[in-house]
């Protein structure tokens, strides 16, 4: 009987707790040219968010060079 109550308690808790990902937020990658939905980002990219199909939205890393160092 206790096991049955435990199972029902766990099931009710699973259905009352909201999911980690909000359905209100935008799950799509922005339509700019440097965003891509992939399963793994390349070495020159970093992850931004999850896409609708649970792939990762990747963006190119912007590396700025601030001139040469002087000794």
UniProtKB/Swiss-Prot annotation:
Describe its function. Has antibacterial activity. Upon stimulation with lipoteichoic acid, promotes cytokines and chemokines production and secretion.
Task: Detail the disulphide connectivity of this chain as listed in its UniProt entry.
Answer: 29-57, 37-51, 41-58
State the organism of origin: Pan troglodytes (Chimpanzee)
Q: Which GO terms describe its cellular component?
A: extracellular space
Q: Which gene encodes it?
A: DEFB131A
Tell me where it resides.
Secreted
Protein name per the record? Beta-defensin 131A
Q: Which residues cross the membrane?
A: none
Q: What GO terms in the biological process aspect are recorded for it? A: defense response to bacterium; innate immune response
Signal peptide start and end residues: 1-22
Q: Which UniProt keywords apply?
A: Antibiotic, Antimicrobial, Defensin, Disulfide bond, Secreted, Signal
